[in-house]
Structures are given as C-alpha cells and as structure tokens.
C-alpha cells in the first residue's frame, strides 16, 4: 500500500479537541488524518489531572451522548469521582473525576488506534495549503504535503507559545514540547483576527515528601461510585484514592507579595490576559488582599506515580519563590518540587470570525476548535473538537452543518457565546451561562442529543440500543406512575404518614405523590409493601437502573417548570432561528445607528438570535432588522421541521 497523502479531513493537534475532532470525523465516514507533533502525547492532560465540574461535567456528558470518548476514557482512568452540588437542584449537579494521567492517555490512544477511517501520523505542521478562499491541505515540518477538503486546527497553547518562570522565558507549547512558531506566522499571513492569552500551571510535588498527617482528607463518593459515561460501569474504575486539603497562610501571602517584583505578570513581561476563574496564586493574593487563607487541594496524578498536583497555586513566580511558598504551607514544610510551575502565553483567534459550525468565515473548509478559539479547559476543548470534526465531515460530504442551539445543549451555549460575543479572557463554561439550564441537565444529555447523534452518524449500534432501552423504560415507568392510583382505603394510614406526614384524604396517582417535597421515587414505589413498584425490574444493570429512576423522578417533580421553560423556548424560537442573508449590507437597514450597522457588518451574524447577543445591538435594532427583512422578503426560518428532523435538529446550511 502506498503512503496515503490525500484525505477528506485533516486534524492538526492531538489534545482533547483534536482527538474528539478526529474520532467524530472518522465516525462520520470521512477519511481522516490526525497530525500530531508527538504520538506519545495524544490525549495528554497538560495541566490538572481532573475532568468535569460545574458546567464542565455537563459538556462531558453531552460529548458522551454524541458518541465522544472523554467520558468513557475517564471511567477507565478515574481514581476519584464526586457529584458536586448533590444537595442542590438537578440543573446544577455535576460530576467531577480525578484521572490517572497515564491511564487516560492510554484510553484515548486505544480509541484512536482502533477507529476505522482514521490515520495517525507524527509530524508538526508548519503551513496550511490555501487556494483562493479554500484550505486544501497541510504541510509538515519536513515538507510532506497532505491534501484534504477540510482541515480542523486544534493547536492548544502551541501557537507562538512562550513559557515564563519568573523573568526567564523561552518558546514552548507546554513544558517539554516545542511551540508552533511557523504555523502561527502562517496564520497571521491569512489576516485572521488574533490576540494573545495566558494560562498557567502549579509546581508538581513528590508525595513522598508530604506530611499527610497534617492534612485534611477528601475522599470521593464511594456508595455508589459515580460514572461519567451513559454506558459506564463502576467496575471499570481503577483503584480509588483520596485528595488532601491544605491552606495558604499569612506567611505564604507575604512570600508571594515579596516576589511580585520578579513576577512576569506584575512587571509587564506577560501581555496576554489570564483566566478569571482559574487565577494564579499571585492574582488571588492581589485581588483578595483581605483574605487570610486560600484552600489548596493536593490531587494525586496517578496510581503509578508519587506526583501530586497542588490545585490552587498556579504560578509564574521565580522558582526560589515557588519553593518558599510551597514550604510555608501545612504538611508541605519538606515538600520536594518535581516540576516548577509556569505561565504560558499563546496566540488565539477571535471566535467572532467563525461560523456557528466552527468553520472560519474567511477560509472555506478551515475549522478551529479548543484554545485557539479563546477557551480554557479540557472539557470545552473536547466539546468544540467533536463539533468541528463532525461539521468538517459533513462539509466534505456536502451536507448541512449541525449547529446546536442554546436551548438544546451547553455545547450550543458555548459556541454561541464564542461566535457572537467573542472573548476578552479565556472562556470557561458555567451553568450560570445557560438560560435554560433546567432543561440542560447532566442527567438528560442523552435524552437531548443521542437521537440527533444517531441521525448525524456519530452514535454506534451499541450506544443506540442502550439509549433506546433507557428511553423506553423511562417513558413506560412515567406513564405507570401517572396511571396508578391509591385511595384512603387502599393506602394504610401509617404508610401515608411515614411518607407524606399525614394520611391522604382522596385519590392520588403515584405521580402526584412523587411531586410532593421530600418524596422520592423509591419511597412511592415502596408503598403498600412494595405493591406500588414496577411489576418487572426496570433494568438489570444497577447504573442504568439508577439513571432510569433519576430521569423518572426529575421528569415528574419538575414537570411544571420544564413545561414553562419549553413554552418560553417556543416563544423565542421564531426570531432565534431566522436566518440572515449572507450578502446583506446593514448600512441599508433604515433606522440602524452607525455603531450597530458597523458591528453587524463586521461580525456577520448568521441568525437574528446571534445578532441580538452582539454587544451594543439593542432590542430596538433587532426590531428594525426584522422589519427590513420582512419588507425585502429576505428572512427565512432555519429549515422546516421535517428538514430539521432529517438533518439533526439545529442544522444550518453550509456555505461551500
């Protein structure tokens, strides 16, 4: 067999965005090439050894519902699992896992090496091949030219990356890896709008030099141990380990303040903006000067290493200051640092220059995903990667792009925020960013997206069969609870009092009882000596059984709220998905201010919904725009219901 140099899709970069992009494109049936500077670092967790969290866990569940790899890889490598906000409402509950770095990489690589239609090749990319307004391939550092109809660029922090430790700095994509300087220069030649951002990582500590007797232990959830994937099982997890907690103190803060004159952040050496919600320890001490202590989590890096990740002290201070501040904390008085912390500056490109499909507006067939779009976090990268890979595959197949809506997925919220609002700092997902978060829960990500994923070609038979069984079981059990009744005569007073606090005074369905505060699904099913439970088990697998029960309980308890949110979505839908013509000149829209028309002409929103979320575009301006479209007969809805069903709900035409 000759060495292949022609592909449908090329993915550049093998991080969390690149691996999901390559897998998605290949699952679509596109002949896909993944180019990485080092095959050994495929799926590498460059910073913290954890997956998930508030908002982030929602994205991981959505990637999983669409057939992605991150959740399943976490189940196979997770050494601690926790449900965050477990005492709060279902909208904000989130799964978080500590992962063994080596096992996680192995799980991702196994999937890549066994994915049909996917080729791997180790070479850094120095150039993109562009003909006119189209990308046609990529050129590696030794001059190999690979041609393709679509390219997905997932360069992470590698584009002209510069690493800072104190006032020393050097080029690098991350510690131990070279920066992509030539590729960065080439992208700048293409006149794509770009800027600089910054992120950082803490020093790593040898666990053998930590005095754990002085620390507070933080175990994971053990009964039961959570799973991330909808197909996951708790017996997939390796050995579980605790995390540990220490704190900074006034001496720590004094040490940090004393080192600020050699901090690249506070001496103007670093120009890029860092992440607001994952600040360096220098920023914490400066911004929260009155706070006497900050909590620091010591997280194990894996089962076969003594290395610990001190979550909360990301820093670019000089190494001697890092050593002193670590030794100032309880339990770390004699700690040995294995790797220094550092900050890294890198190029990103203004995501407002992207379509909602993550294809660049300027160059057809070129897609961006991950930190190149101004986001931070493994989960945000993976979600974008899956979407970009999917749409690159659909692009070469001459099919319409799939662009999830804000009311459909956190992925839709993420992309819409990026392409309409841009970023002034690294973007991180939170549940607070989603206006329809009661409908966008972790637990129902498969109910929202797996059917769409099946239509798009992302979901295999095994996942589809498991989902279908779950969906049907939830539907049957919900209907059973609605149609099963108890009366004062059939429900013993003592049972009613134990469950409800008092006897019932008239006939109730089991669903009506379940809606009451403090009443659980198991409590209702246990009435009348268990006679109110299902005649047959809902599922044999205990994880699936809990998922079904959770879906049934939430669906019934929150039915009224969910229906009201659905009505709100329907009211907003008319304008949200009205498409804007590609060639419209907003200066011709009567009544629009110069500022608004200038912004609309600059950012070229694809829909009325996107236009309404651009900073400075007022509701009055949207009304004028709607009148203009109606007068000219230009506005059109985003496809019929039948088309949406055929394309996967939320499809928009690809401009080719």
Swiss-Prot record:
InterPro entries: FAD/NAD-bd_sf, GIDA_C_N, MnmG, MnmG-rel, MnmG-rel_CS, MnmG_C, MnmG_C_subdom, MnmG_C_subdom_sf
GO cellular-component term (any): cytosol
Subunit and interaction comment: Homodimer. Heterotetramer of two MnmE and two MnmG subunits.
GO biological-process terms attached to the record: tRNA methylation; tRNA wobble uridine modification
Localisation per UniProt entry: Cytoplasm
Cross-referenced Gene3D superfamilies: FAD/NAD(P)-binding domain (3.50.50.60), GidA associated domain, C-terminal subdomain (1.10.150.570), tRNA uridine 5-carboxymethylaminomethyl modification enzyme MnmG/GidA (1.10.10.1800)
Identification of the protein by name: tRNA uridine 5-carboxymethylaminomethyl modification enzyme MnmG
GO terms of molecular function: flavin adenine dinucleotide binding
HAMAP family xref list: MnmG_GidA (MF_00129)
Domain of life: Bacteria
TM spans (from-to): none
Binding site for FAD: 13-18
Pfam families listed in its UniProt record: GIDA, GIDA_C_1st, SAM_GIDA_C
Main location, first listed in the record: cytoplasm
Binding positions for NAD(+) per the UniProt entry: 274-288
Keywords: Cytoplasm, FAD, Flavoprotein, NAD, tRNA processing
Cofactors, names only: FAD
Protein's job: NAD-binding protein involved in the addition of a carboxymethylaminomethyl (cmnm) group at the wobble position (U34) of certain tRNAs, forming tRNA-cmnm(5)s(2)U34.
Entry's family note: Belongs to the MnmG family.
């Amino acid at each position: 067999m000759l060495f292949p140099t022609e592909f449908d899709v090329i993915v550049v970069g093998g991080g969390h965005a690149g691996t999901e992009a390559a897998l998605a494109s290949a699952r679509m049936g596109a002949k896909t090439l993944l180019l990485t500077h080092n095959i050994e670092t495929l799926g590498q967790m460059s910073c913290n050894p954890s997956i998930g969290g508030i908002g982030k866990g929602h994205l991981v569940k959505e990637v999983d519902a669409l057939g992605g790899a991150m959740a399943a890889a976490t189940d196979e490598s997770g050494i601690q699992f926790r449900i965050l906000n477990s005492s709060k409402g279902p909208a904000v509950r989130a799964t978080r896992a500590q992962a063994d770095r080596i096992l996680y990489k192995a799980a991702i690589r196994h999937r890549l090496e066994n994915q049909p239609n996917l080729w791997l090749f180790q070479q850094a990319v120095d150039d993109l091949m562009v003909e006119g307004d189209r990308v046609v391939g990529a050129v590696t550092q030794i001059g190999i030219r690979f041609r393709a109809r679509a390219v997905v660029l997932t360069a992470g922090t590698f584009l002209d990356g510069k690493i800072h430790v104190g006032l020393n700095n050097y080029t690098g994509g991350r510690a131990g890896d070279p920066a992509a300087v030539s590729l960065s220069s080439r992208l700048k030649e293409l006149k794509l709008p770009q800027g600089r951002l910054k992120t950082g990582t803490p020093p790593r500590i040898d666990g053998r030099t930590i005095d754990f007797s002085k620390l507070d232990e933080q175990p994971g959830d053990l009964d039961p141990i959570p799973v991330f994937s909808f197909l996951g099982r708790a017996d997939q997890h390796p050995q579980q380990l605790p995390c540990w907690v220490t704190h900074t103190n006034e001496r720590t803060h004094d040490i940090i303040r004393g080192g600020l004159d050699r901090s690249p952040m506070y001496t103007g050496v670093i120009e890029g903006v860092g992440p607001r919600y994952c600040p360096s320890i220098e920023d914490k001490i400066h911004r929260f000067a009155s706070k006497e202590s900050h909590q620091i989590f010591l997280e194990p890096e894996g089962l076969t290493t003594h290395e610990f990740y001190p979550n909360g002290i990301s820093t670019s201070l000089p190494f001697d200051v890092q050593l002193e501040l670590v030794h100032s904390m309880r339990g770390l008085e004699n700690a040995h640092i294995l790797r220094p912390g550092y900050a890294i500056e890198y190029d990103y490109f203004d995501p407002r220059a992207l379509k909602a499909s993550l294809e660049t507006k300027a160059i057809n067939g070129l897609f961006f995903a991950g930190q190149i779009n101004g986001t931070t976090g493994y989960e945000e990268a993976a979600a974008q990667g899956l979407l970009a890979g999917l749409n690159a595959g659909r692009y070469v197949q001459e099919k319409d792009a799939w662009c999830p809506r804000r009311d459909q997925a956190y992925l839709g919220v993420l992309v819409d925020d990026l392409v309409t609002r841009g970023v002034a700092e690294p973007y991180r997902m939170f549940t607070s960013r989603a206006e329809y978060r009661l409908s966008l829960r972790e637990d129902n990500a498969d109910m929202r997206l797996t059917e769409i994923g099946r239509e798009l070609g992302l979901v295999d038979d095994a996942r589809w069969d498991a989902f279908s069984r779950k969906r049907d079981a939830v539907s049957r059990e919900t209907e059973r609870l609605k149609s099963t009744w108890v009366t004062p005569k059939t429900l013993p007073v003592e049972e009613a009092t134990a469950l409800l606090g008092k006897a019932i005074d008239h006939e109730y369905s089991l669903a009506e009882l379940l809606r009451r505060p403090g009443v659980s699904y198991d409590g209702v099913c246990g009435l009348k000596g268990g006679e109110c439970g299902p005649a047959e088990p809902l599922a044999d697998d205990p994880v699936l059984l809990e998922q079904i029960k959770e879906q049934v309980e939430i669906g019934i308890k929150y039915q009224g709220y969910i229906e009201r949110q659905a009505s709100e979505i329907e009211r907003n839908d008319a304008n949200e998905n009205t498409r804007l013509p590609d060639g419209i000149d907003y200066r011709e829209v009567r009544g629009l201010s110069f500022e608004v028309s200038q912004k609309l002409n600059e950012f070229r929103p694809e829909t009325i919904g996107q236009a309404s979320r651009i900073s400075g575009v007022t509701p009055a301006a949207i009304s004028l725009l709607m009148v203009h479209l109606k007068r000219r007969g230009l506005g059109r809805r985003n496809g019929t219901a039948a088309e949406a069903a055929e394309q996967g709900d939320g499809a928009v035409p690809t401009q080719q």
